[in-house]
Amino acid sequence: MKKILVADDETSIRLLYSEELKEEGYEVYQAANGLEALEIVDKIPLDLVILDIKMPEMNGIEALRQIKEKRPDLPVVLSTSYGEYKQDFATWASDEYLVKSSDLEDLKAVVKRYLKE
């Protein structure tokens, strides 16, 4: 079973994404900030990380940088409510950029693209 980490400071988003991904057959872990995300990356052989950009304690951009230092092969999808970040996406080392939405089809499509069986 493929393992996904959902890191977001908004509990409702974490739960929404986690439940949807579990229904799709993935094992899902959750983190409320970048520091928690790094701890999980260190302990669990993940297949994908979905990372919010704005989080307390350590933001998603810094967490992304550290994740890619440790696991350059691990796909990381940046997720945000702020569409204006799209112009900055190319300068970050993430694999994908996703604007949060209640329509989870984009999320599922991105996950399937990176976790093809």
Predicted regions and their residues:
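Conserved sequence signature across two-component system core domains
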Residues: 7-8, 31, 49
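Charged docking surfaces used in two-component/phosphorelay signaling
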Residues: 15-23
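Short hydrophobic/Thr-rich beta-strand motif most characteristic of the beta2 strand and flanking loop
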Residues: 25-32, 40
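Acidic catalytic/metal-coordinating carboxylates
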Residues: 33-36, 59-62
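Active-site residues of response regulator receiver
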Residues: 52
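Receiver (REC) domain active-site loop signature in two-component systems and cognate sites
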Residues: 55
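Alpha4 helix (beta4-alpha4-beta5 surface) of REC/receiver domains from two-component response regulators
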Residues: 62, 82-100, 105-109
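Hydrophobic/aromatic residues positioned on beta-strands within the core alpha/beta folds
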Residues: 77-79
